[in-house]
Every structure is written in structure tokens, then in C-alpha cells.
Amino acid sequence: MTTKLTVVVAAVGLVLAVVPVRAHHAFAAEFDQAKPIKVQGSVTRWELTNPHSWIYIDVKDADKTVTWMIEGASPNNLYRLGLTKESLPIGSVITVEGYQAKDGSTRAVGRDIVFANGKKFFLGLMEAEGAPKQ
């Protein structure tokens, strides 16, 4: 009886531990497929941190400059896709396509970045649960 109870408690604990992890990786939890974005701006910061990288770009609007925070895949995934720390020097002008945060802020998940020379890179997060299919 004690062994069965231990197994049941352990199984329930594992199931409960998986739920927050799935929510963390669910595209639909934070981003809106109905809000595609395409912004062009200058890189002001690039954080290659786990579990996700962040690219900050200043986008000039009609009368002001707005900073967009673009979420990308982990540094390891980006390296495998061909992006390194040297790929995005501060001041680089890039175009980002992706999906805006549900809260309407200037935060988005990036799908692709395009450099001034036309070279395009996938940012690696579109396999997340609930993400739009390319």
C-alpha cells in the first residue's frame, strides 16, 4: 500500500511540474498571432542569455523613437543557425518580423531578422506550442 501511494504521489507531482513548463513554452500564452509586426531599427543591445535571447532595437516613429524588445531562441540554437554575438553589433540596422505581445507593449517574439545586406535569419521560436505555422 505504501509503495502504491508513493508512486501515485510521485506521478501527480511530475504532472503538476510539467504544466508550468508547457505554459512557459506556449506561444499563445504571451504573443498574439493576429498581431504580426515588421519593424526596422538600430540594435541597441543584444542579450544572449538562457532560456531566450533578447534583441533591443530603436525604431523611429513619426515623432519619437520607440524601443522594441524582440525575443529569440536560446544562444545555443542561434549559434547553430549561424548567429553569433558578432552578428549584431550595436548600431546595426535590422528588420524584424514576428508577433507582438498580447498586452500591446513594444515586445515581440521574432520570427526572422533581415540585415541591411538582405541576409535573412530565422530566430528559432516558431516551433513553440501555439505558434503560427510558416
Residues of each region from the PLM?
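Bacterial N-terminal signal peptides
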Residues: 8-18
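Bacterial N-terminal signal peptides that target proteins for export
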Residues: 1-9
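Conserved hydrophobic positions within beta-strands
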Residues: 39-43
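Short boundary/loop segments of OB/S1/cold-shock single-stranded nucleic-acid-binding domains
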Residues: 22-37
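Short nucleic-acid-contacting surface segments enriched for D/E, G, S/T with interspersed K/R
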Residues: 80-96
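Short aromatic-glycine-enriched beta-strand elements
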Residues: 49-59
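Short, structured beta-strand/loop micro-motifs enriched in basic residues and often containing a Trp
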Residues: 71-80
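OB-fold/S1-family single-stranded nucleic acid-binding modules
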Residues: 101-125
